[in-house]
């Protein structure tokens, strides 16, 4: 049973090593290849012209109805005439913005503009976030217009039949003001000259939520049928982090279907949907939720009326060598009789995935499961409370690094009864180690009798041989939950600790390989070995030396090299996670020392260290 315990610990450690190592040797090269491929692509400029003849039953990306618009009629989110067009060179972002008259967006959190030509929200930058820890570095740009290198925008409007010209990418709206603020909405109007007057009221709060209220008044002699839609479109596959613990790509909660997550690679494998060259998935008859595109820290999502049924869809389509990703919702038919009007209300989230902000939108706006916009992972029930605890102590101490230390200490105290029983059992096993060795020697050729004798010894001394596994097993979900919090929550981004750690979500910037910056080169990730990873490795080594070496020489070698392996593996992990592990190891050493002394068991740390270094000295002398 003692060997079973050791084997279990080794298996867990090796499993962790495989999972962590996968990112180094498999995922990272794939991500780099994708980045190089994307850099070689030329992004086409594009516009949008909502169709006069869309079959609404097929969703926003549906092919035009031949009876109404003909085979070349444009569709929302597509490039008019794209089938026969050729890609154009991308413009600089400022040049692309200058191609259309605009109304400024200016709030506490956002700056940007609304394009009057097309009526899109296609220019959004985040005031409170910068590209690096330097506050003078450029602000994060989230949305960009058609024609730029990385088009990413939101579009809202109507599709329908027998309605005449509908607002599209070439439509120039009339605005009632020159700025959109949290206190001053913007009203856009357009008369299609065929009896329909379109009015759009745009408002924005002091964070990242836009409200789009569309109305159509029918002044013509005939009834029309219209379908409201909202979409988020992204041209070109973006550079992704490429980690298995993080979702990047299409995301949504679609009515009763719940959370839907599709990576960019997964979209390429979907079945054809709608227009030729388009792949995707759709969910008709949904009510409530959202659909969008998410990055690690940022997202853009269209939010349909939470009480009205809609068809949701994720699509990928080909525009030359460029992939276009789109998340969209298409509402049900709205009949507009002569002299009548119809309204549709939708929202757009475009900003940082701040936990408090996202949670507040879910509660105040009643957006179904909107908090899942943040990728809390499988351990949601642990990960989110973990963040809440860290955030609580951050508000008390003003430092997330200190918060990590405090939460780790509280977790240690919370699990103290389990750990105490575990360490007491381990201490007792150390006390009977001579008897266990004698049993192994006495029944060396009879494993059955050896096990029976061991069990009798455990029963006599009241030892639980698997109790030592509990601290390791308990730490695994806590470790991954903290890793998830550090990795996906924007609150940890650019959060400093002390000294040289200016970003807990980034690796320790120092490296022993270049003598902590004295040598003028940057080592590769695999050789990136900062101060905190070294401290973690030392504490892990000391923790293992608290116990005698396993009798099996193979296991002893595994235990010897494990701290070295983990030191290199965690070298490129978030500094906050490495600090947690080092601090947790130190607390475990102190806890085990106290319990062993309390139970009258000799602490063999110094003896084991002395034995280890003496043995290595003897080996070197023998070789010499």
Swiss-Prot record:
Known function: Required for the insertion and/or proper folding and/or complex formation of integral membrane proteins into the membrane. Involved in integration of membrane proteins that insert both dependently and independently of the Sec translocase complex, as well as at least some lipoproteins. Aids folding of multispanning membrane proteins.
Annotated family: Belongs to the OXA1/ALB3/YidC family. Type 1 subfamily.
Membrane topology: Multi-pass membrane protein
Predominant location: membrane
Annotated region described as Disordered, given as residue ranges: 36-95
Cross-referenced Pfam families: 60KD_IMP, YidC_periplas
Composition bias type Polar residues, residue spans: 43-64
GO BP terms, alphabetized: protein insertion into membrane; protein transport
Record-given protein name: Membrane protein insertase YidC
TM stretches of this protein: 8-28, 370-390, 396-416, 470-490, 526-542, 559-579
GO CC annotation: plasma membrane
Compartments (UniProt record): Cell inner membrane
Gene Ontology molecular functions: membrane insertase activity
Keyword vocabulary terms for this entry: Cell inner membrane, Cell membrane, Chaperone, Membrane, Protein transport, Transmembrane, Transmembrane helix, Transport
Self-association and partners: Interacts with the Sec translocase complex via SecD. Specifically interacts with transmembrane segments of nascent integral membrane proteins during membrane integration.
């Amino acid at each position: 049973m003692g060997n079973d315990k050791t084997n279990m610990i080794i298996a867990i450690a090796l499993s962790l090593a495989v999972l962590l190592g996968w990112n180094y040797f498999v995922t990272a090269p794939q991500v780099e290849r994708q980045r190089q491929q994307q850099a070689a692509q030329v992004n086409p400029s594009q516009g949008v012209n909502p169709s006069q003849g869309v079959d609404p039953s097929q969703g926003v990306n549906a092919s035009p109805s031949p009876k109404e618009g003909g085979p070349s009629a444009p569709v929302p989110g597509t490039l008019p005439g794209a089938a026969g067009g050729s890609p154009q060179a991308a413009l600089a972002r400022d040049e692309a913005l200058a191609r259309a008259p605009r109304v400024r967006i200016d709030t506490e959190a956002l700056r940007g503009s609304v394009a009057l030509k097309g009526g899109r929200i296609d220019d959004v930058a985040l005031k409170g976030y910068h590209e690096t820890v330097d506050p003078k570095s450029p602000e994060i740009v989230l949305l960009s217009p058609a024609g730029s290198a990385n088009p990413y925008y939101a579009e809202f409007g109507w599709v329908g039949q027998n309605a005449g010209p509908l607002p599209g990418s070439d439509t120039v709206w009339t605005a009632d003001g020159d700025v959109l603020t949290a206190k001053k909405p913007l009203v856009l109007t357009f008369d299609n000259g065929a009896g329909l007057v379109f009015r759009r009221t745009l408002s924005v709060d002091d964070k990242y939520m836009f409200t789009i209220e569309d109305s159509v008044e029918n002044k013509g002699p005939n009834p029309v049928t219209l379908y409201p839609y909202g979409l988020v479109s992204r041209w070109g596959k973006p550079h992704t982090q490429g980690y298995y613990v993080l979702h990047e790509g299409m995301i949504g909660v679609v009515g009763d279907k719940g959370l839907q997550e599709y990576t960019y690679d997964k979209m390429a494998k979907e079945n054809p949907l709608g227009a030729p060259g388009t792949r995707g998935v759709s969910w008709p008859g949904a009510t409530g939720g959202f659909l969008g595109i998410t990055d690690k820290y940022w997202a853009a999502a269209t939010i349909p009326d939470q009480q009205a049924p809609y068809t949701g869809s994720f699509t990928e389509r080909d525009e030359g060598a460029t992939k276009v990703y789109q998340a969209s919702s298409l509402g049900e038919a709205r009949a507009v009789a002569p002299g009548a009007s119809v309204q549709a209300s939708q929202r757009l989230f475009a900003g940082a995935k701040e936990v408090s902000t996202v949670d507040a939108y879910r509660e105040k706006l009643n957006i179904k499961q909107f908090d899942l916009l943040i990728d809390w992972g499988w351990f949601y029930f642990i990960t989110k409370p973990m963040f809440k605890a860290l955030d609580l102590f951050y508000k008390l101490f003003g430092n997330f690094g200190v918060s990590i230390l405090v939460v780790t200490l509280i977790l240690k105290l919370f699990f103290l009864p389990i750990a105490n029983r575990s360490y007491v059992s381990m201490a007792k096993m150390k006390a009977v180690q001579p008897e266990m060795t004698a049993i192994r020697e006495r029944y060396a050729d009879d494993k059955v009798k050896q096990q029976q004798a061991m069990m009798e010894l455990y029963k006599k001394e009241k030892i639980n041989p698997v109790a030592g596994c509990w601290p390791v097993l308990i730490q695994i979900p806590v470790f991954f939950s903290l890793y998830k919090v550090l990795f996906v929550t924007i609150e940890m981004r650019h959060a400093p600790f002390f000294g040289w750690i200016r970003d807990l979500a980034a690796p320790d910037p120092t490296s022993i390989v270049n003598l902590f910056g004295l040598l003028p080169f940057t080592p590769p990730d695999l050789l990136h070995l900062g101060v905190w990873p070294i401290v973690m490795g030392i504490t892990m080594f000391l923790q293992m030396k608290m116990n005698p070496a396993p009798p099996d020489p193979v296991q002893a070698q595994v235990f010897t090299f494990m701290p070295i392996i983990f030191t290199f593996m965690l070298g490129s992990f978030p500094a906050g996670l490495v600090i947690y592990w080092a601090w947790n190891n130190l607390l475990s050493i102190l806890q085990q020392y106290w319990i062993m002394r309390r139970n009258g068991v000799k602490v063999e740390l110094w003896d084991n260290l002395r034995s280890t270094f003496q043995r290595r000295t003897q080996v070197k002398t023998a070789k010499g």
